[in-house]
Design a protein with these regions (language model features):
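Active-site neighborhood of HAD-like aspartate-dependent phosphohydrolases
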Residues: 1-53, 57
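C-terminal cap/substrate-recognition subdomain and adjoining C-terminal extension
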Residues: 2, 6, 64-238
Length: 238
């Protein structure tokens, strides 16, 4: 049975900067480098998913850019075991939430033409008065994929990267699972930071990279218990 690591991530303020909804190529390379190291330490493949209430055509554009970043990273890896799989799946707001008015037909056709097949609708709660519909949808996606993966693979670790209120339920779910970790950048709500010790001192993608690096340090410590730890090390245990 294939050994895998499930990695779920939000977008705004995590993968993408809050200021301009972009990421630097160098920052992404460093993030992917830490994921590659995680694969090596766990002897398992990372399967990454993106969850965000953005529109599905926006998600398609982002996945296209991420695919290019993964391709560029993999080209530089001589060892096949260090290469990463492309994003496995994503959830974004359903098309009908963004299709209305006289532009309906044009917009719908644009969705049909552009939408990446990996994207599914972010499920909405049955209660229209739910104050956190994105949080409901994210949790539904995370639970569904995790359950399916546990039937098909040997899931060695589950990681959730997020920073906001609509990430909290998914964070709690991942924390409740064996091998579950939550990673937050510094620009996270205090409610999110309270759910983990893996909080980066930097913002956005750099903060996530630091959090994944800290998981790698924990794994390295387990593999080499005699290795000295930094004096300011404040990490949760594996």
């Amino acid at each position: 049975m294939e050994k895998i690591i499930l990695l779920y991530s939000d977008l705004e303020g995590t993968i993408l900067r809050e200021s301009d909804s972009k990421y630097d190529d160098t920052d992404m390379y460093n993030f992917l480098k830490q994921l590659s190291r995680l694969q090596e330490l766990m002897d398992a493949k990372v399967r990454m998913h993106i969850v965000s209430p953005i529109s599905q055509n926006q998600m398609t554009d982002i996945l296209e850019k991420l695919d290019k970043s993964f391709t560029n990273f993999n080209r530089l890896q001589k060892d096949p075991s260090k290469k990463l799989k492309y994003i496995e799946g994503a959830a974004a707001s359903s098309k009908d939430e963004f299709v209305a008015g006289p532009q309906q037909d044009f917009t719908f056709n644009r969705f049909v033409r552009k939408m990446d097949s990996r994207i599914v609708d972010l499920k909405r709660p049955s209660n229209p008065d739910d104050k956190n519909p994105a949080g409901f949808g994210k949790l539904n996606y995370v639970k569904g994929w995790t359950s399916m993966a546990q039937e098909r693979y040997d899931v060695k670790m589950i990681i959730y990267c997020g920073n906001g209120m609509n990430d909290l339920a998914s964070m709690d779910y991942v924390n409740s699972k064996k091998g579950g970790f939550v990673v937050c950048p510094d620009n996270s709500r205090h409610e999110a930071k309270a759910r983990t010790k893996l909080v980066g001192r930097k913002t956005d993608l750099q903060g996530l990279t630091e959090g994944i690096a800290n998981i790698n340090k924990l794994l390295e410590k387990r593999l080499n218990p005699n290795k000295e730890e930094p004096e300011d090390n404040d990490q949760q245990s594996l």
